[in-house]
Amino acid sequence: SAYKQKPLAVVFPENTQEVSKILAYCNQERIKVVPRGAGTGLSGGALPLMDSILLCLSKFNKIIDIDYKNKCVVVQPGVTNLSITQAVEEKGFYYAPDPSSQIACTIGGNVAENSGGVHSLKYGTTTNNLLGVEVVFMDGTISRLGGKTYDSEGYDLLGLITGSEGLL
């Protein structure tokens, strides 16, 4: 990339509470935050700004649960698409919104960009394959949107977050 900015700092939180504290501090001090997964996106959403903190989520790389009966996988945002597919392929499943960068790209980046690939025509993009997320807002508030069922009452806040490129 021709864009070469160094952020104020790069942080590697290891849990949601650390992310919450970092965001609350940055919000209070009016410091910009750029979330980053694997950095494979082409829109520039994960490029640091010189007056920002780069929030690297690469340590959030665990598959939490695989529920074959309900066709649901719970993962942290740093898990790669390929890791999800490899974890479920023995039962004939795969992660359908498969961008060409699936070897390196992470599910967190997919959510931020609403990514998709060749199977998206049939199965939809990330937003069509996502049941829920845990988000941390700039004030440090931790919230869960969605759940283990596709349809829920009220506004589609999950759809609003998906594809927001970390801006919300």
Q: Positions of the model-derived regions?
A:
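Glycine-rich N-terminal segment of FAD-binding domains in flavoprotein oxidoreductases
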Residues: 1-60
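FAD-binding subdomain of flavoenzyme oxidoreductases
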Residues: 62-168
